[in-house]
């Protein structure tokens, strides 16, 4: 086992334990996991962040300052403290592995679902995410009750449904639901309707 993998395992489990111990209910735990996903989204779209963390010429203090400047006002203090700890222990260079193993462990051992809501670009488009979340959460919970094999070591009575929102150019109107965990996409966009109509006309 590589050093990267060993560090990733240890700190990923530590992060999951901290999030569970520091939250008193389902909603707060879900919000914290959502913050982790927000961090992952930015981290994955900005390769220079990983390069910065991996650069040994920058001190732990400089890396912590970067985290504060970039994420300090948007991420939960619990998650920020964990990231600061990684800087102090010089394990921040393994952040990609740690987050990957954390999400893999979370999804494997709980009845969790990640849903990416894809919307058109533009300020004029509005989608009631809270209403959509309520609808899908109820759907997932219904499935959970019918699935005796579901494993949930965190002992929550509800399915953990984590939403991320992604703007997609060219989507026109409507929206798409990308069920990341289940590898499914449901297309409610105008572009999707046009595509289905074209398929019928070309039949």
Swiss-Prot record:
Its main location: plastid. InterPro entries: ATP_synth_OSCP/delta_N_sf, ATPase_OSCP/dsu. The keyword Transmembrane helix does not apply. GO terms for molecular function: proton-transporting ATP synthase activity, rotational mechanism. It holds the Pfam family OSCP. Keywords: ATP synthesis, CF(1), Chloroplast, Hydrogen ion transport, Ion transport, Membrane, Plastid, Thylakoid, Transport. It is found in: Plastid, Chloroplast thylakoid membrane. The keyword Protein transport does not apply. It comes from the Eukaryota. It is a peripheral membrane protein. One of its GO terms (cellular component) is chloroplast thylakoid membrane. PANTHER family: ATP SYNTHASE DELTA CHAIN (PTHR11910). F-type ATPases have 2 components, F(1) - the catalytic core - and F(0) - the membrane proton channel. F(1) has five subunits: alpha(3), beta(3), gamma(1), delta(1), epsilon(1). CF(0) has four main subunits: a(1), b(1), b'(1) and c(10-14). The alpha and beta chains form an alternating ring which encloses part of the gamma chain. F(1) is attached to F(0) by a central stalk formed by the gamma and epsilon chains, while a peripheral stalk is formed by the delta, b and b' chains. Belongs to the ATPase delta chain family. F(1)F(0) ATP synthase produces ATP from ADP in the presence of a proton or sodium gradient. F-type ATPases consist of two structural domains, F(1) containing the extramembraneous catalytic core and F(0) containing the membrane proton channel, linked together by a central stalk and a peripheral stalk. During catalysis, ATP synthesis in the catalytic domain of F(1) is coupled via a rotary mechanism of the central stalk subunits to proton translocation. This is ATP synthase subunit delta, chloroplastic. The lineage of its organism: Eukaryota, Sar, Stramenopiles, Ochrophyta, Raphidophyceae. The gene is atpD.
């Amino acid at each position: 086992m590589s050093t990267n993998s060993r560090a990733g395992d240890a700190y990923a489990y530590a992060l999951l334990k901290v999030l569970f111990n520091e939250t008193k209910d389902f909603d707060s735990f879900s919000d914290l996991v959502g913050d982790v996903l927000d961090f992952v989204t930015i981290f994955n779209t900005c390769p220079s962040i990983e390069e910065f963390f991996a650069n040994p010429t920058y001190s732990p203090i400089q890396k912590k300052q970067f985290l504060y400047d970039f994420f300090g006002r948007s991420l939960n203090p619990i998650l920020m403290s964990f990231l600061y700890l990684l800087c102090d222990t010089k394990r921040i260079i393994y952040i990609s592995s740690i987050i990957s193993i954390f999400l893999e462990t979370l999804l494997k051992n709980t009845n969790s679902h990640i849903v990416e809501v894809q919307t058109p670009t533009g300020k004029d488009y509005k989608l009631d995410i809270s209403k959509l979340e309520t609808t899908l959460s109820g759907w997932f919970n219904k499935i959970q009750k019918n699935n005796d094999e579901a494993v949930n070591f965190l002992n929550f009575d509800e399915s953990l449904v984590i939403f991320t929102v992604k703007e997609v150019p060219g989507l026109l109107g409507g929206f798409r639901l990308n069920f990341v965990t289940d590898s499914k996409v449901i297309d409610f966009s105008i572009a999707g309707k046009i595509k289905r109509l074209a398929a019928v006309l070309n039949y």
